[in-house]
Structure formats: structure tokens, C-alpha cells
């Protein structure tokens, strides 16, 4: 548990350092919404089928001199139970660092990764929710349009739950204003 707190604290400090870049005036803040399919894997994939997710995001882009931005995502996932098993709902709040590859004009590929809080609950009477820490990593691309942009990304999420970790892969399509 202490190791997770140290890793989380280091992540937050790195994000704060990235946001205090002297070229902060070149940064852009965006609000966005997204949705897509969620593919459960591992033990979670044994119990549930492909589901869906919706996501809200607040993004601060990197600058020309430091192409590292920060993004806070809130996401809801619904995974259908297999056979007669219950559906599983996963709420997340993640802080992520985003490295945008330089040189992109209308299309900018990026790498994203971070950590956050995951609340998981089976949709059945008497089930208790579980609050856990998790991490995520993925790749995506941002597509600049007039006055807004769209994005597509795929990420791997690992939730450190007890007794087994839960993994899922959301494929996301969204819009940023």
C-alpha cells in the first residue's frame, strides 16, 4: 500500500512540474466527452463480456518546448455478465500524463499513462462495491478540426483489487472543445 502511495505521489509531482513549464502560455486547456467499447481481459474477461464506457475529460496540452500534457478523466464502464452472472460497473477517476509526438499538425499521435481510483461493483442484490487503486497506459491520436479536435485511443487498465487484479481495455472515440 505504501509503495502505491509513493508511486502516486511521484506521479502527481511530475504532473505539477510539467504544468509549471515556462512556456505555459502556449498550453491549451480542453474539455471533452467520449465513448466506446470496453473489452474485459483476465479474470474480469472470464466473468463478463464486452461492454461500453462513457468518459469526461479535462486536458491541458503540452507546449512546443515540452510536449507533455496532463489529463484528468472520469469514466463509467458497464460490462455485461456472462451466462446468468451479474453485470459489473466500474467508475474511475484518473490523472494521466500525455506525451504528444512533436511535428503533428492536423494529426498528433500520443502516449498516455497514469493512475487513479477505481470503484467496482457487481450489479446484484447485496453486492458491495470495491474501491481500489489502478494504473493505465495507452496510445492515441488527436485530430485537429476548426475550433475543436477529436481523438481515438486504446488503453490498458489494471486495477489492483483483492484477491485478483482486474484488467480492461477501453477503445475510445471522443471530442475536445
Predicted region positions:
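Intrinsic low-complexity/disordered segments
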Residues: 21-23, 50, 150
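Surface-exposed strand-loop-strand hairpins of Gram-negative outer-membrane beta-barrel proteins
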Residues: 38-55, 130-131
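Cleavable N-terminal export/targeting peptides
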Residues: 1-28
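Gram-negative (and chloroplast) outer-membrane scaffold detector with strong preference
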Residues: 52-125, 132-135, 143-148, 153-154, ...
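A short acidic/glycine-rich loop-to-helix N-cap element
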Residues: 44-47, 161-166
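Transmembrane beta-strand segments of Gram-negative outer membrane beta-barrel proteins
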Residues: 26-39, 111
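A short, acidic, flexible beta-alpha connecting loop/helix-capping segment that sits on the rim
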Residues: 155-160
